[in-house]
Amino acid sequence: MAYKNFKFDVDADGIALVTWDIPDRSMNVFDEISTQEIGEIIKQTTSDPAIKGVVITSAKEAFCAGADLSMLEGMNRSYAQLFKEKGEEAANQMLFEQSRQMSQSFRAIETSGKPWVAAINGLALGGGFEITLACHYRVAAENPKTRLGLPEIKVGLFPGAGGTQRVPRLVQPADAMQLLLKGEAVNLTRAKALNLIHAVVPAADLIKAAKDWIKGGGKAVAPWDEKGFKLPGGPVFSKMGMQMFPAGNAIYRRETYDNYPAARAIMSCVYEGLQLPIDAALRVESRYFTKVLRSKEAAAMIRSLFLSMQELNKGARRPAGVPPTKVKKLAVIGAGFMGASVGYVSAQAGIDVVLVDRDLESADKGKGHAKTVVDGLIAKGRMKQDAADAILARISATSDYNVISDCDLVIEAVFEDRKVKADTYAKAQPLLKPGAIFASNTSTLPINSLAEEFKDQGKFIGIHFFSPVEKMMLVEIILGKNTGDVALATALDYVRAIGKTPIVVNDSRGFFANRCVMRYISEGNEMLLEGVPPAMIENTAKMAGMPVGPLSLQDEVALDLGLKITKATEADLGPNAIDQAQKKLMVEMVEKQGRFGRKNGKGFYDYPEKGKGQKSLWPGLANLQPKQLDPDTLSVEELKQRFLVVQAVEAARTVEDRVITDVREADVGSILGFGFAPFTGGALSYIDFMGTKNFVALCHSFEKKYGSRFTPPKLLEEMAAKGETFYGRFPPKKQAA
């Protein structure tokens, strides 16, 4: 029988080799065809007495990247349609049956009576890893890049094809929960130590090793189907179980604040499933998976963190008609922390980099940052010396501007001062080669005003990185009014080449991300001045889904920098453009108290010397509050909502102002750029899933109590009146360049 996505061969020993190779895709995924065909292959191999065993592998570099989440979106659409036609019970049953097809197929592998071997030749994630767990033997090809894992939690789901039941039956409970709840992939050494795979062999011997295991009498029985099987950590109701599950629940609550239905479902699946035989446990898993799949959190996270991000990473915003560009050599002018970091990630991606600064000592210091980073990675076993040497060899440092004359892209990363930037542009412009693109990494100064110092404004663009550059995945590309398509295409191609996710925004003070995050910071300061206890401010922000509290965030950014930005905004736009009470607070903190944040060991928090305890809120904050409110009189829910609403309403303003022209970018940008509660799907999805009518009503409620910062823009009022959503009114274009 011929298959579309699999090659099927049987050798003289009766061993079937099933090779996964989806046409016209760089990676295998479980789409509808693959799911259907693997079911047919299982039936064929089980029923054919001539077949003695099965080896499943991949013809691609990776084994399988997991389920095609757009297939799950289709299931949800079918659910919604059936719900309308036949009601909730029929729709739930349909979703349950559809969502457990993979789980049933994988169980059929285990119980087929024929030995199955997973010959893992590369990356295996999600459903791609779950099918290997259902095989009776797992052998992997030696490859330091191979990772195995179950990352579904990162898009609001959990492993629904047996992962929550097989992993804790193979692995010690604490390790199993880490794999499931964090969604982090492990290398082969770690996977073997955890008992997730049985063997690692040279790539050339992979298929032979798999077949040899079958020919050597490999048993076609899963461990949990054998009589006398014992869980690695003992029964749930045992001393170890009682130590693990209560502590696990506490850790889960601490990390998620119960905002993620999938995380709660994982805890329940494992706890309930380990008390049952495997078949009943798999049904429990499928029930929970069906429930989570219907949740707004899963729908929002799948849309933003998988579908939208994938589309943006593939170049959804790239202008049509511009040939592909490649930055072979990059100049970074300004080798401070930000510039040095940009240089490092570029060199890591294979781009030759020259760091330019006012003197050689400063430029060399920038290159030294790259050495510090690679030395740290080597010490942690995450980079080989030869790879580190290659990165460092691609970075040169100089004080001579003439070196930029053969660069394809020049990024300015000097101090946030108009005069300093203007001087830099004056030096650089005469040296640029024809066709070179010039970008500013400014984080606050409008691109249009900076472009006035540039003769060919068509080749001038903003490329705003977020700190720390090595970790932050978002890059804002800012268009000036005269920025050309080639400049935009070059910027997008470069950002994609260094493995970051780009969003394209129009010029505005603070662009998109800083406009929204400054609202978050300001709301924290407002609460402080209202008399809300500082600890309550920080904790309710994290309960709302933010990664760090607003006071802690200011310490990380640096309070003196925040004050400089405030003063610059006031100088440019006048005294009404800033909150004078907040300025007074920051003047007190920085100029009178000398508290700059983490960098000098004291800000809103006190920071002990390394290794001498944890940071703690500065007791002196109480003296800066005009009054102090009793926490028992405050609504935790209202404080949480204030943090999210004030950011979301600003995101809506950026759409009205045409700073954001693609709603996907607001959602992806808000999550990757400043950690806006990921379970909401992003700032605009937060509004959409709440309903624009409800959101506007909440805005007006807060507006009456707290002021005009909560006033919804006219666009939102209009959308609420019509019952529109952002994704309905501004449907994204799906094409990618």
Language-model segments: what does each one mean?
Residues K4-F6, D11-D13, D21, L72-Q81, ...:
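N-terminal glycine-rich phosphate-binding loop for ADP-containing cofactors
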Residues I15-T19, E37, V55-T57, V117-A119, ...:
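Structural motif
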Residues I33, S47, K60-R77, F106:
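Amphipathic alpha-helical interaction surfaces in cytosolic regulatory modules
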